[in-house]
Swiss-Prot record:
Deleted gene: phenotype: Complete embryonic lethality, due to defects in blood vessel development that lead to heart failure. Mutant embryos display increased branching of the internal carotid artery and of blood vessels in the nervous system, including thinner and more highly branched brain capillaries. Endothelial tip cells present an increased number of filopodia.
Organism: Mus musculus
Domain TSP type-1: from-to ranges: 246-300, 302-354
GO biological process, alphabetically ordered: angiogenesis; anterior/posterior axon guidance; apoptotic process; axon guidance; negative regulation of extrinsic apoptotic signaling pathway in absence of ligand; negative regulation of neuron apoptotic process; positive regulation of phosphatidylinositol 3-kinase/protein kinase B signal transduction
Domain Ig-like, chain residue ranges per copy: 48-145
Domain Ig-like C2-type: 153-242
Protein family according to the UniProt entry: Belongs to the unc-5 family.
Stretches for region Interaction with DCC: 707-725
Record protein name field: Netrin receptor UNC5B
Signal peptide, first to last residue: 1-26
Sugar attachment sites: N222, N347
Post-translational modification note: Phosphorylated on cytoplasmic tyrosine residues. Palmitoylation is required for pro-apoptotic activity, but not for location at lipid rafts.
Ranges in the topological domain labelled Extracellular: 27-377
Domain of life: Eukaryota
């Protein structure tokens, strides 16, 4: 009340000073002369301008805060707090003169005490603002809010001690006490402040948690969460983290020698628990440190002589012989050989003949034996030389013959490449000649006849050879045609004719661009035959889409397939434009091989080009055919490396901070947040043989049948839009039509085959040509998911062309599992018009490329408000974490916590999920449950809820 009376008295005083009591007559001066109607007026004084405005302040304990205001030109400055004028006595005023302008500068100061702030009732904070007067009017300053600063003593959540194995992730949670201003949080490791910029193994999340990416032995320490603001500093209880190492066995040592050198014994081997040794309380190695086994060592047997043989007849040299062998027993198992001589001789004439009488063990007593050995060795040497000479002669003959054939093949391959031919001595190429690109097709003879004189591009280097394999090169290439030129037309650069399709397996079309011969072959030499080269080529429009995107983002979609790529706003750097594409790989060879109970659950999808810099994750959506039941599946995402082999990216529910992506699994699709573009496929592995795949069964028949035979094709496909679309396109080329709407079938991991059979055939007019009662598709053909258009054909025959009605039942079931029955009734004379065309040409969404704001359901202004409101951690948990929980995206929150805007990434994922819905109801419901009513008002104002 006193403040108001003071202000009134000040205003009254100002009015009295400005009031002139002297009356005056308009247009008459004091002498009675008529005055002019107007005088030149002085320039009007400007409105007050604030040089200093009051700033927000906090009252610490009982110390009042000072608020300052400075303005010019100003005759008066007063403070107004919470709508009431502050007493003039509480103002401290200073005046000065601005030397530059000569105007008077007025500065006012007041103090606000804790008591004044506490006496305020209501939800609004205590505020003050300045009001400055001049002769031209008044000006108000900004509002300055004054709050009582505090910091509670108790933490909402304190870190807990943990024992973790080496190289595992560690999460220490901390929720600081409530305070004004909001407390800043830092972590201490053994009383040293943790700086993630210096040690990247540490990560501080946006909600103040500490994450150790891979625990090291050096990370064993005491960790403390510290919260501080201008009032106080609080420390949490210390959490001790122990990084332990479980012991591991070393390799087994070699087996020791057998304990007995002869007969039965024992031998053992040992290992030590040192690979690694247990540390910090880690578990000791499980198992035995040594192994013992029985051994049997075969005893050695020494050789012994047999009895001497009888003496031989007396020879011309007056001697006879006898022999013995070391065979009683022979030496075995390392036993000693017999000692002594093999042969023995003596004079057989009782001394009548003494010529050359020597014993055989005398080396000089066998001159004939020595000469015989020399002759034998000489003969062997001569034989070796003869064999070598014959082999060399044969080799020379074969080499010359191969050279002639090779030269002819080179000539033929050059002619095939250049379009020319030889008028004489033309030899048909061998079918197995690897130098020819197209051995089974005749050369292109549209070029002028004669021998080609220009350079020959025979593609003989290893980098130029195009292998004839089932690699991904053969399937996606769209009609690579090679133009060939004669020497007479090289100068003009025009080709004479188009060559045959490369490898003879490509669909019709032309190679992009108008290349000359040299440029084209240079491209073949420099380009890689891997996936990166193929991605630049034109593709089937039904399985490929591309677009140019900037920083505003957009969406690529393949209609009728469930495959899309969402590029969020800000994912592409400012000022850059990327040509992005999305492609479904149809070839079976582009799918990874299934091992064990693994199965391919989605199509192989390529988004590219790879290696682009992305500022935030993009969202790739692919359909899958898994019946999602918790605990039945082990899901994996795999990517194709540059060498063509597949590598695991992530196993769901086993993510760590180093995982480069996040998978949001829905009932029939999977949304993948990616930092890198590439080729991806979603796979699953049955856990304890309880997993179930969703299949769809489709029956096709010929649209027009003019013969007695009639066939039914029963397809067993993965329950994805991609699989059905491929079969519809295939049947359209075969002239078939869909007899009945596809039906679902649950296929269990039970090793049981899929059985198909026909029933209730009208035998009076039809008969089945199938000898057996049923057909079966092996379990692994269905389960692995890598075989496209899997089907069985039932061939029937009608007795006459007059039989145009056909009815039967088709039963498809898994042995000891579920099944489906089709009741068919068709008229052969009626051709269903356009049934497949309607299915193939009417996808759920015909738009393939959406750019900028048109691709998103949430307007950018609403998105920014939601992010600014939910990104900051809230002690009540009413932030992005609760939003993720409400939207069922909280499977691994640490992925979002590492992003600059967790809310933005969650909204990107929501955008990918809501591609077909097109409204904001689910998001609005989540925000309403969170109590974010101001966001609902913004959505109702700016959006189209």
């Amino acid at each position: 009340m006193r403040a108001r009376s003071g202000v009134r008295s000040a205003l009254l005083l100002a009015l009295l000073l400005c009031w002139d009591p002297t009356p005056s007559l308009a247009g008459v001066d004091s002498a009675g002369q008529v005055l002019p109607d107007s005088y030149p007026s002085a320039p009007a004084e400007q409105l007050p301008y604030f040089l200093l405005e009051p700033q927000d302040a906090y009252i610490v304990k009982n110390k009042p805060v000072e608020l300052h205001c400075r303005a010019f030109p100003a005759t008066q400055i007063y403070f107004k707090c919470n709508g009431e004028w502050v007493s003039q006595n509480d103002h401290v005023t200073q005046e000065s003169l601005d030397e530059a302008t000569g105007l008077r500068v007025r500065e006012v100061q007041i103090e606000v005490s804790r008591q004044q702030v506490e006496e305020l009732f209501g939800l609004e904070d205590y505020w003050c603002q300045c009001v400055a007067w001049s002769s031209s009017g008044t000006t108000k300053s900004r509002r300055a809010y004054i709050r009582i600063a505090y910091l509670r003593k108790n933490f909402d959540q304190e870190p807990l001690a943990k024992e973790v194995p080496l190289d595992h992730e560690v999460l220490l949670q901390c929720r600081p006490p409530e305070g004004v201003p909001v407390a800043e949080v830092e972590w201490l490791k053994n009383e040293d402040v943790i700086d993630p910029a210096q040690d990247t193994n540490f990560l501080l999340t946006i909600d103040h948690n500490l994450i150790i990416r891979q625990a090291r032995l050096s990370d064993t320490a005491n960790y403390t969460c510290v919260a501080k603001n201008i009032v106080a500093k609080r420390r949490s209880t210390t959490a001790t983290v122990i990084v332990y190492v479980n012991g591991g066995w070393s390799s087994w040592a070699e087996w020791s020698p057998c304990s007995n050198r002869c007969g039965r014994g024992w031998q053992k081997r040992t290992r030590t628990c040192t690979n690694p040794a247990p540390l910090n309380g880690g578990a000791f190695c499980e198992g035995q440190a040594f192994q013992k086994t029985a051994c049997t060592t075969v005893c050695p047997v020494d050789g012994a002589w047999t009895e001497w043989s009888k003496w031989s007849a007396c020879s011309t040299e007056c001697a006879h012989w006898r022999s013995r062998e070391c065979m009683a027993p022979p030496p075995q198992n390392g036993g000693r050989d017999c000692s002594g001589t093999l042969l023995d001789s003596k004079n057989c004439t009782d001394g009548l003949c003494v010529l050359n009488q020597r014993t055989l063990n005398d080396p000089k007593s066998h001159p004939l034996e020595t000469s015989g050995d020399v002759a034998l060795y000489a003969g062997l040497v001569v034989a070796v030389f003869v064999v070598v000479a014959v082999l060399m002669a044969v080799g020379v003959i074969v080499y010359r013959r191969n050279c002639r054939d090779f030269d002819t093949d080179i000539t033929d391959s050059s002619a095939a490449l250049t379009g020319g031919f030889h008028p004489v001595n033309f030899k048909t190429a061998r079918p197995n000649n690897p130098q020819l690109l197209h051995p089974s097709a005749p050369p292109d003879l549209t070029a002028s006849a004669g021998i080609y004189r220009g350079p020959v591009y025979a593609l003989q280097d290893s980098a130029d050879k195009i292998p004839m394999t089932n690699s991904p090169l053969l399937d996606p290439l769209p009609s690579l045609k090679i133009k060939v030129y004669n020497s007479s037309t090289i100068g003009s650069g025009s080709g004479l004719a188009d060559g045959a399709d490369l490898l003879g397996v490509l669909p019709p079309g032309t190679y992009p661009g108008d290349f000359s011969r040299d440029t084209h072959f240079l491209h073949l030499r420099s380009a890689s035959l891997g996936s990166q080269h193929l991605l630049g080529l034109p593709r089937d429009p039904s399985s490929s889409v591309s677009g140019t995107f900037g920083c505003l983002g957009g969406r690529l979609s393949l209609p009728g397939t469930g495959v899309s790529l969402l590029v969020p706003n800000g994912a592409i750097p400012q000022g850059k434009f990327y040509d992005l594409y999305l492609h479904i790989n149809k070839a079976e060879s582009t799918l990874p091989l299934s091992e064990g109970s693994q199965t391919v659950l989605s199509p192989s999808v390529t988004c590219g080009p790879t290696g682009l810099l992305l500022c935030r994750p993009v969202v790739l959506t692919v359909p899958h055919c898994a019946e999602v039941i918790a605990g039945d599946w082990i899901f994996q995402l795999k990517t194709q490396a540059h060498q063509g082999h597949w590598e695991e990216v992530v196993t769901l529910d086993e993510e760590t901070l180093n995982t480069p992506c996040y998978c949001q699994l829905e009932a029939k699709s999977c949304h993948i947040l990616l930092d890198q573009l590439g080729t991806y496929v979603f796979m699953g592995e049955s856990y304890s043989r309880s997993a179930v795949k969703r299949l769809q069964l489709a029956i096709f028949a010929p649209a027009l049948c003019t013969s007695l035979e009639y066939s039914l094709r029963v397809y067993c496909l993965e329950d994805t839009p991609v699989a059905l679309k491929e079969v519809l396109e295939l049947e359209r080329t075969l002239g078939g039509y869909l007899v009945e709407e596809p039906k679902p079938l649950l296929f269990k991991d039970s090793y049981h085959n899929l059985r198909l059979s026909l029933h209730d055939i009208p035998h009076a007019h039809w008969r089945s040509k199938l000898l057996a009662k049923y057909q079966e598709i092996p379990f692994y053909h269905v389960w692995n998911g890598s075989q496209r258009a899997l089907h069985c054909t039932f061939t029937l025959e009608r007795h006459s062309l007059a039989s145009t009605e056909f009815t039967c039942k088709v039963c498809v079931r898994q042995v000891e599992g579920e099944g489906q029955i089709f009741q068919l009734h068709t008229t052969l004379a009626e051709t269903p018009a356009g049934s497949l065309d309607a299915l193939c040409s009417a996808p759920g969404n015909a738009i393939t490329t959406q750019l900028g704001p048109y691709a998103f359901k949430i307007p950018l202004s609403i998105r920014q408000k939601i992010c600014s409101s939910l990104d900051a951690p809230n002690s009540r948990g009413n932030d992005w974490r609760l939003l993720a929980q409400k939207l069922s995206m909280d499977r691994y929150l640490n992925y979002f916590a590492t992003k600059a805007s967790p809310t933005g990434v969650i909204l990107d994922l929501w955008e990918a999920r809501q591609q077909d819905d097109g409204d904001l109801n689910s998001l609005a419901s989540a925000l309403e449950e969170m109590g974010k009513s101001e966001m609902l008002v913004a959505m109702a104002t700016d959006g189209d809820c």
